[in-house]
């Protein structure tokens, strides 16, 4: 048990180019901590976190261009990646083999996310649609249309009820998954929404934008519950802590910040990266944060819990 924030581990030269995406999944049953990274070097790498360090398990080849997004299933040993090559690939984390390659269409595979039950994969498109693919079928099952601009970011609510998307023009849309209806359109930012994340109880939505602000919304009523400033440049990624009371953000200002949801304040800032920090995630119990960036490094931080 630590009672302070500190950097625990640095993996230098983790990739041969900028690292744009990271995911961390904790398998509580088998006590396995898996980190997946995606880089502009076209590779997806699978790491195991054990004994306070990252060990490279698989280096997954297949994408022809840079990897822009990765996610790990919450229920199956599967990772997904999307790339500038317009393909989504599904990977078996037990043997490091590619399971499926899905042709999503040009610029139609940006951020991707597994549904909470891992039956579907959602990805934003440049035409303002969210395409939903079946994990089993590898085919497009349906689309949700924002009638808006290029969707840079998407997130499922943990309770499986909502899907939120963030567009290049700063518009946020929240869909009801059961009906496919657009519930709310939020005009919260004037610049691209790089990332959004739901709280573990699915009540709040946190958004990150190039305008340098982080916003917190009450999902049910679509009310703005807070505007947070502190980053000196674009906010590139946000991720909620499993404890429901903190979230983490990363920015072009090279920093990683931890925020208290209740007080809407920044409680710690890490300045360990040498360049833009594209991705941040918590582990399963909120005791660790992982970050990745243009400096080709993976950092793991200790958090008090």
Swiss-Prot record:
The modification N-acetylthreonine is found at residue 2. Keywords: Acetylation, Cytoplasm, Nucleus, Repeat, Transcription, Transcription regulation, WD repeat, Wnt signaling pathway. SUPFAM superfamilies: WD40 repeat-like (SSF50978). WD repeats lie at residues 14-57, 62-101, 104-143, 146-187, 188-227, 230-269, 272-305. Its main location: nucleus. GO terms for cellular component: Cdc73/Paf1 complex; cytoplasm; cytosol; euchromatin; nucleus; Ski complex. SMART domains: WD40. InterPro entries: G-protein_beta_WD-40_rep (IPR020472), SKI8 (IPR051510), WD40/YVTN_repeat-like_dom_sf (IPR015943), WD40_repeat_CS (IPR019775), WD40_repeat_dom_sf (IPR036322), WD40_rpt (IPR001680). The modification N-acetylmethionine is found at residue 1. Belongs to the SKI8 family. Component of the PAF1 complex, which consists of CDC73, PAF1, LEO1, CTR9, RTF1 and SKIC8. The PAF1 complex interacts with PHF5A. Within the PAF1 complex interacts directly with PHF5A. Component of the SKI complex which consists of SKIC2, SKIC3 and SKIC8. This is Superkiller complex protein 8.
């Amino acid at each position: 048990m630590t009672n302070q924030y500190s950097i625990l581990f640095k993996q230098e030269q983790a990739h041969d180019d900028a690292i744009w995406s990271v995911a961390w999944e904790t398998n509580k049953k088998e006590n396995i901590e898996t980190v997946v990274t995606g880089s502009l070097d076209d590779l997806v790498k699978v790491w195991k976190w054990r004994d306070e360090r990252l060990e490279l398990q698989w280096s997954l080849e297949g994408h022809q261009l840079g990897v822009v997004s990765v996610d790990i299933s919450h229920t199956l040993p599967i990772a997904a990646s999307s790339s500038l090559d317009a393909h989504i690939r599904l990977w078996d984390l037990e043997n490091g083999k590619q399971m499926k390659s899905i042709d999503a269409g040009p610029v139609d595979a940006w951020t991707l996310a597994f549904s909470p039950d891992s039956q579907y994969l959602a990805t934003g498109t440049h035409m303002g649609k969210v395409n939903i693919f079946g994990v089993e079928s590898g085919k497009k099952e349906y689309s949700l249309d924002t009638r808006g601009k290029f969707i840079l970011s998407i997130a499922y609510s943990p309770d499986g009820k909502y899907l939120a998307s963030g567009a290049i023009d700063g518009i946020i849309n929240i869909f009801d998954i059961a009906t496919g209806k657009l519930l709310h359109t939020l005009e919260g930012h004037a610049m691209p929404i790089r990332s959004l994340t739901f709280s573990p109880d699915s009540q709040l939505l946190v958004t990150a934008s190039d305008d340098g602000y982080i916003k917190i919304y009450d999902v049910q009523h679509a009310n703005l519950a807070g505007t947070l400033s502190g980053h000196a440049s674009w906010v590139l990624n946000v991720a909620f802590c499993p404890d429901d009371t903190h979230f983490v953000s990363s920015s072009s200002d090279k920093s990683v910040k931890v925020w208290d949801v209740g007080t809407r304040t920044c409680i710690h800032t890490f300045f360990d990266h040498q360049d833009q920090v594209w991705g941040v995630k918590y582990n399963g119990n909120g005791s660790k944060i992982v970050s990745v960036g243009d400096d080709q490094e993976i950092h793991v931080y200790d958090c008090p819990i």
